[in-house]
Amino acid sequence: QNHMGIIFITHNLGVVAEVCDKVSVMYAGKMVEQGPVDDIFYNPGHPYTKGLLRSMPRVDAESYERLIPIEGTPVDMLNPPEGCPFAPRCEHAMKICLQKMPPYVAMGENHRAACWLRVQDCLEEAKKGNTETANIEKTEVDSHE
């Protein structure tokens, strides 16, 4: 619109929703999800993104609703894990999550997430013959630091 861009680094997702068109969600220096702001907010593909959204106050929530924290402790950046950096805190972590970074999986036009759960979803779709929804990018997350 204005032929300019701004890199806005924040945990304030309310401001992100108001200011941004595109969002890159990072955890421990790795981009784990990227896409249009509405896709990220209404169809998050990475467990960290989902955790961020669950942990923020909502205007439409009842006043007695408690925020849901992301369990665990942040990754030790001096000794990062081999696999997905969020795996030790992820309630859905599988063995492969601890061993290897996942590839990006397309979740829609210009929306992708780096999560082995999404890869499993894509593999299931491919087995069913739904190749349109089984879109796994060959680029590894490590190259997108």
Protein language model annotation of sequence segments:
Residues 1-65:
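P-loop NTP-binding/switch modules centered on Walker-like glycine-rich loops
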Residues 138-145:
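Long, low-complexity, intrinsically disordered segments
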Residues 37-132:
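Charged, flexible cofactor/metal-binding loops and thiol motifs
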